């Protein structure tokens, strides 16, 4: 059973950009040390992001990376795979929310180096507790194991929010009990962001 922290999924549209041009754009973006996630967090997107992280780490270790996030969230395990790899590399990571960072997307926005969590003015951030997907089946003992694992996952997410915001466990527990939506400014005041920005120059000067 997959553990997820996500908004409802939407259909993916095929890119209208010709493949050769899309490849050139992708290479130019990666060469500028920018990594994007613009869809759900799953095993596919996690694998792609991790490969890019290690490519940048191996080619120029220690040089800053900008991680741009516009995501409705997704699978917890896939999100933590990205989180752990970002913490392992030597390159400092800046996160920039543009559009939406919901659920696991909001967790990923917190993986930045200290003082490097940014968002654009019209971005939104949503936090909540992890969701179960699919039909729950099995023996009573199996369901008990799943429930315990879910609780451990929930507490782990709460601890990340606690460390990121400076709020206590009970305050975060209350905030994620239901979907909590925030504007960029509200997320800044809550402690999920370091700055709301209007230009890339503000990132470079911080």
From Swiss-Prot:
EC top class, as a word: hydrolase
Alphabetical list of PROSITE patterns matching this protein: CLP_PROTEASE_HIS (PS00382)
Record keywords, A-Z: Cytoplasm, Hydrolase, Protease, Serine protease
GO biological process: protein quality control for misfolded or incompletely synthesized proteins
GO cellular component entries: cytoplasm; endopeptidase Clp complex
Entry annotation: catalytic residues: 103 (nucleophile), 128
Keyword Thylakoid part of the UniProt annotation: no
Catalytic activity: Hydrolysis of proteins to small peptides in the presence of ATP and magnesium. alpha-casein is the usual test substrate. In the absence of ATP, only oligopeptides shorter than five residues are hydrolyzed (such as succinyl-Leu-Tyr-|-NHMec, and Leu-Tyr-Leu-|-Tyr-Trp, in which cleavage of the -Tyr-|-Leu- and -Tyr-|-Trp bonds also occurs)
Pfam families, alphabetized: CLP_protease
NCBIfam families named in the record: PRK12553.1
Summary of the function given for this chain in its UniProt record: Cleaves peptides in various proteins in a process that requires ATP hydrolysis. Has a chymotrypsin-like activity. Plays a major role in the degradation of misfolded proteins.
Name assigned to this protein: ATP-dependent Clp protease proteolytic subunit 1
Organism, as annotated: Protochlamydia amoebophila (strain UWE25)
Name of the coding gene: clpP1
């Amino acid at each position: 059973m997959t553990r997820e922290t996500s908004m409802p999924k939407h259909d993916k549209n095929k890119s209208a950009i010709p493949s050769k041009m899309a490849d050139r754009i992708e290479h130019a973006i990666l060469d500028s040390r920018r990594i994007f996630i613009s869809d759900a967090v799953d095993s596919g997107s996690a694998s792609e992001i991790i490969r890019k992280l290690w490519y940048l780490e191996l080619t120029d270790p220690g040089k800053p990376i900008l991680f741009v996030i516009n995501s409705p969230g997704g699978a917890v395990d896939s999100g933590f795979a990205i989180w752990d790899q970002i913490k392992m590399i030597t390159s400092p990571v800046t996160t920039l929310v543009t559009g939406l960072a919901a659920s696991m997307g909001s967790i990923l926005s917190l993986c930045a180096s200290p003082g490097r969590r940014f968002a654009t003015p019209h971005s939104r951030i949503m936090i909540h507790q992890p969701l179960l997907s699919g039909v729950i089946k099995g023996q009573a003992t199996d369901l008990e194991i799943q429930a315990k694992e879910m609780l451990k996952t929930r507490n782990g997410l709460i601890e990340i929010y606690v460390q990121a915001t400076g709020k206590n466990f009970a305050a975060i527990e209350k905030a994620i009990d239901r979907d909590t939506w925030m504007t960029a400014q509200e997320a800044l005041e809550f402690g999920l962001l370091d700055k709301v920005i209007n230009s890339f120059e503000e990132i470079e000067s911080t």
